[in-house]
Amino acid sequence: MNDILREIGMIARALDSISNIEFKDLDLTRGQYLYLVRIYENPGIIQEKLAEMIKVDRTTAARAIKKLEMQGFIQKLPDEQNKKIKKLFPTEKGKKVYPLLRREGEHSTEVALSGFTSEEKETISALLHRVRKNIERDWEYVKKGNKRDY
């Protein structure tokens, strides 16, 4: 039973390593593709929401966003109502690589779930969603500087 999170971690690290290798030619490394995909799918998202969506701290998100911006994959544009708020958008370069990133994600999902019935796919999706929701409570708690009691 204790091996479940280890299995999830191994799967996540393996998929991340595969993506980092395959996207190296695009100069997308260290999970930057995750940010680019979310920005493409949520144009105008703000940095804080993106960090929350990916489940990273603001500093980690800021570094990745800065690098993507310097590489020309995304741009920050001021909000029309509040110029202090910067919204994130993919550039033409970012839009151009998105289909490849999407295909890789679909392929990885297909490989990961090969041999599963439709019912099993629905079940694993529902169970993982519940696991994520459980972990999100702790994430929100410790993010505020609290310590879990274990």
Swiss-Prot record:
Sorted UniProt keywords: DNA-binding, Transcription, Transcription regulation
Domain HTH marR-type: 1-133
Gene label: yybA
Protein name (Swiss-Prot/TrEMBL): Uncharacterized HTH-type transcriptional regulator YybA
Species this protein is from: Bacillus subtilis (strain 168)
Alphabetized GO MF terms: DNA binding; DNA-binding transcription factor activity
Any one Pfam family match given in the protein's UniProt record, by short name: MarR
DNA-binding region(s) in UniProt: 47-70
Tagged with keyword Disulfide bond: no
Lineage: Bacteria, Bacillati, Bacillota, Bacilli, Bacillales
SUPFAM superfamilies linked to this entry: Winged helix' DNA-binding domain
